[in-house]
């Protein structure tokens, strides 16, 4: 059964007495071209271990299972877990379905038990929109054994991930994503590619992990500066960074030493400039 077929999907849901749960962001992808594009972007090999978050009814899972060595699905909705057990897990011996909350489950343990020594997994998923940003940040910050993330996200979130300094969409998420990975938008996806249709369009993003950060600064100091700068976007840097508990005069001196105009705002700074501020500020405190 091709689960990307709308008729088959409706019949399957009726068979199990299920309806899409809006509170869980359940919009099922039914566009075969987009599904194939996601799998292609992940560049799957027969030895790959894939973590799929929010597999829904298994439309993407089918295609992942045909390409990867192992697919581990984490699904929050108990009703969908039963469907996944009866369909994709029984049809593919390389699929494992886990009932759990991807925002809380111990991903280090989950992946560590399924990877060979030195191996890294890939995350490939159509993410529920209500958890996109915190989940992506978790995948970035927790030093998980991951090499590549390919996910469907809300169009506006995708734009934020790849936005350059000075653009309207540039923010703390942009900096974090570009610090840890090399991001690119793979596909723009119409809301008509889903059932039921969401209220927004989407995009598929590829986040390939860097071997090392692109800038030289202590990570904790770097991200403290970033959070402070974007936490009060309308304020100048010299005023926003005082929220770090540093005297305004010391902030002013650190900015000037880094070659940064104290009157600039956080959204105008590049990663290298944030790193320069972090280095000079922490040398003076």
From Swiss-Prot:
* Enzyme Commission number(s) of this protein: 2.1.1.182
Q: Which NCBIfam families match?
A: ksgA
Checking SMART domains in the record gives: rADc (SM00650)
The organism is Symbiobacterium thermophilum (strain DSM 24528 / JCM 14929 / IAM 14863 / T)
Please give the family membership noted in the entry: Belongs to the class I-like SAM-binding methyltransferase superfamily. rRNA adenine N(6)-methyltransferase family. RsmA subfamily.
Sorted UniProt keywords: Cytoplasm, Methyltransferase, RNA-binding, rRNA processing, S-adenosyl-L-methionine, Transferase
Protein name (Swiss-Prot/TrEMBL): Ribosomal RNA small subunit methyltransferase A
Q: Name one GO molecular function term.
A: 16S rRNA (adenine(1518)-N(6)/adenine(1519)-N(6))-dimethyltransferase activity
Which InterPro entries is this protein grouped with?
A: KsgA/Erm (IPR001737), rRNA_Ade_diMease-like_C (IPR023165), rRNA_Ade_Mease_Trfase_CS (IPR020596), rRNA_Ade_methylase_Trfase_N (IPR020598), rRNA_adenine_dimethylase (IPR011530), SAM-dependent_MTases_sf (IPR029063)
Q: Which top-level enzyme class is recorded in the Swiss-Prot or TrEMBL entry?
A: transferase
* One GO cellular component, as annotated: cytosol
Q: List locations, semicolon-separated.
A: Cytoplasm
Q: Where does S-adenosyl-L-methionine bind?
A: 27, 29, 54, 75, 101, 126
Q: Which reaction does it catalyse?
A: adenosine(1518)/adenosine(1519) in 16S rRNA + 4 S-adenosyl-L-methionine = N(6)-dimethyladenosine(1518)/N(6)-dimethyladenosine(1519) in 16S rRNA + 4 S-adenosyl-L-homocysteine + 4 H(+)
What PANTHER family does its record include?
Answer: DIMETHYLADENOSINE TRANSFERASE, DIMETHYLADENOSINE TRANSFERASE-RELATED
Taxonomy of origin reads: Bacteria, Bacillati, Bacillota, Clostridia, Eubacteriales
What does the record give as the function of this protein?
A: Specifically dimethylates two adjacent adenosines (A1518 and A1519) in the loop of a conserved hairpin near the 3'-end of 16S rRNA in the 30S particle. May play a critical role in biogenesis of 30S subunits.
Using the UniProt record, give the first listed, main subcellular location: cytoplasm
């Amino acid at each position: 059964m091709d689960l990307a077929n709308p008729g088959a999907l409706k019949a399957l849901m009726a068979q199990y007495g299920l309806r899409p749960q809006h509170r869980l962001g359940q919009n099922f992808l039914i566009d075969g071209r987009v599904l194939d594009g996601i799998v292609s972007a992940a560049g799957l090999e027969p030895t790959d271990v894939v973590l799929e978050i929010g597999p829904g009814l298994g439309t993407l899972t089918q295609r992942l299972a045909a390409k990867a060595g192992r697919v581990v699905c984490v699904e929050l909705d108990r009703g969908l877990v039963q469907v996944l057990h009866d369909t994709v897990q029984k049809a593919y011996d390389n699929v494992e379905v886990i009932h759990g909350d991807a925002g809380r489950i111990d991903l280090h343990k989950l992946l560590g038990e399924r990877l060979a020594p030195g191996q890294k997994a890939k995350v490939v998923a159509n993410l529920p929109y209500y958890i996109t940003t915190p989940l992506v940040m978790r995948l970035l910050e927790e030093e998980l054994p991951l090499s590549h993330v390919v996910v469907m996200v809300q169009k506006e979130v995708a734009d934020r991930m790849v936005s350059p300094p000075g653009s309207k969409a540039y923010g703390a998420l942009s900096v974090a994503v570009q610090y840890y990975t090399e991001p690119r938008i793979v596909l723009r996806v119409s809301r008509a590619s889903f059932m039921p249709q969401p209220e927004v369009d989407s995009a598929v993003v590829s986040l390939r992990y860097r071997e090392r950060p692109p800038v030289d600064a202590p990570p904790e100091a770097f991200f403290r500066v970033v959070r402070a700068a974007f936490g009060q976007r309308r304020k100048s840097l010299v005023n926003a960074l005082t929220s770090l508990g540093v005297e305004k005069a010391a902030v002013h001196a650190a900015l000037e030493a880094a070659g940064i105009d104290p009157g600039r705002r956080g959204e105008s700074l590049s990663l290298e400039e944030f790193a320069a501020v972090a280095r000079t500020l922490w040398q003076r405190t």
